[in-house]
C-alpha cells in the first residue's frame, strides 16, 4: 500500500498541482508572475530579483581585487617591488 501510494499517485498529483500553481519549481513561477505583474523587471517577481542579486556580487569581487591587489602591487606602497 505505501509503495504504491509513494510510487505513482502521490508524485503525479503533487507535480500537477505544483506545476499549475508554480510552487517550488521556479520555472513555472516565471511565466505565471510576468503576465500577472506588469513591469516585473523592477524586481516585483522572484525570477527578476534573483538575477540582479547574483550580478552585483560577481562585479564587487573583481573590483575589490583590482583596487586592492593590483593597486598595491603596481604602486608598491606595501613594500613589494614589482
UniProtKB/Swiss-Prot annotation:
One GO term describing the cellular component: extracellular region
Residues that span the membrane, as ranges: none
Coiled coil: none
Tissue and organ distribution: Expressed by the venom gland.
Residue segments, region Disordered: 16-60
Swiss-Prot/TrEMBL keywords: Cleavage on pair of basic residues, Secreted, Signal
Compositional bias (Basic residues): 50-60
Leader sequence segment: 1-17
Superkingdom of the organism of origin: Eukaryota
Record propeptide residues: 38-82
The protein, known as: Putative antimicrobial peptide 7848
Lineage, broadest ranks: Eukaryota, Metazoa, Ecdysozoa, Arthropoda, Chelicerata
